[in-house]
């Protein structure tokens, strides 16, 4: 377990991908962290743009590496561009680093290279949209070193105990064949994504089956894949049936509808820590 945060600690905001469009959400995210007693490095330049990125690759990589000198990096937003930084093999350190969606490429790379601190969770521009329980969960993790159980819908029974990896599904699939994807043997894997067509998800699931990457995982979870307005739609049932059909052959516990991802709360999960996924009752717990 890395050092816990304390009031007065300075933290770093890094934009490894797209530039900031919604300044209001950015500022609201800052306010939340400042209310927790954290000091924000004010060097972040909201006006900087380089095409559709927050800066050029060299600048973004430098800020990512230097930001690790603080206890915590929280990413500003996703979009696209994080994976471009992996071409230059970032110099990682053991420090907390929070993000999701596109920035999962960085979270996974850091863990794959043997460093702790990757947290799949809200970013600056999404913090203000989080329900109170999700914000409290993140605060508990960073300041107190614990998180409570979360719950989903059990799909295939069984209990898995092992280190957990959480990622955006699409980003995870793009890292197959690179040295930035962690070893999956004995791991619990949890995926999130947003508003992908069902045939595209089928394509990725089939690719994962064919890649043999799932032959040695011990549990599988799925977070939010749709925005809230379609949570009870036919598309959700199609996805549930697709997950069952594509992954039942692995004979591992599977839980769906965990509150992780782009809607309904994005429960933070520290990557690489011992966890339990219960496919009998839908519970997921992290053992810190």
Q: Which functions belong to the PLM regions below?
A:
Residues 1-69:
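ATP/NTP phosphate-donor binding region
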Residues 115-177:
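Conserved anion/nucleotide-ligand pocket segment
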Residues 183-239:
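Internal helical hairpin/lid segments
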Residues 90-110, 117-124, 253:
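Short, acidic/small-residue loops that bind anionic groups at enzyme active sites
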Residues 67-72, 216-217:
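Short acidic/histidine-rich motifs immediately flanking catalytic phosphotransfer sites
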Residues 71-82, 100:
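N-terminal glycine-rich "phosphate-gripper" loop used for MgATP/nucleotide binding
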Residues 24, 163-194:
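Conserved beta-alpha junction segments in alpha/beta enzyme cores
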Residues 224-288:
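ATP/nucleoside-binding phosphotransfer catalytic cores, i.e., glycine-rich phosphate-binding loops
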């Amino acid at each position: 377990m890395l050092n816990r945060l304390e009031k007065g600690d300075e933290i770093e905001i890094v934009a490894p991908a797209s530039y900031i469009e919604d300044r209001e959400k950015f500022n609201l995210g800052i306010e939340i962290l400042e209310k927790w007693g954290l000091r924000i490095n004010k060097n972040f330049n909201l006006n900087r743009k380089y095409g559709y990125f927050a800066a050029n690759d060299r600048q973004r990589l430098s800020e990512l590496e230097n930001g690790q000198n603080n206890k915590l990096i929280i990413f500003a937003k996703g979009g696209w561009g994080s994976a471009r930084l992996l071409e230059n093999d970032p110099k990682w350190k053991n420090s907390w680093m929070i993000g999701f969606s596109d920035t999962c490429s960085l979270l996974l790379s850091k863990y794959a290279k043997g460093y702790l601190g990757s947290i799949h969770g809200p970013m600056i521009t999404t913090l203000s949209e989080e329900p109170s329980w999700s914000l409290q969960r993140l605060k508990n993790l960073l300041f107190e070193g614990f998180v409570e159980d979360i719950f989903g819908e059990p799909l295939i029974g069984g209990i898995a105990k092992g280190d957990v990896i959480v990622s955006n599904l699409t980003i995870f699939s793009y890292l197959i064949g690179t040295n930035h994807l962690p070893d999956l043997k004995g791991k619990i894997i949890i995926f999130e994504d947003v508003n992908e067509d069902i045939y595209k998800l089928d394509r990725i699931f089939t690719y994962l089956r064919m890649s043999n990457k799932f032959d040695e995982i011990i549990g599988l979870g799925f977070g939010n894949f749709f925005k809230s307005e379609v949570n009870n739609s036919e598309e959700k049932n199609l996805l549930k049936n697709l997950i069952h059909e594509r992954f039942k052959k692995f004979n591992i516990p599977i839980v769906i509808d965990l509150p992780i991802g782009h809607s309904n709360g994005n429960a933070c999960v520290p990557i690489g820590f011992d966890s339990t996924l219960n496919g009998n009752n839908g519970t997921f717990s992290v053992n810190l």
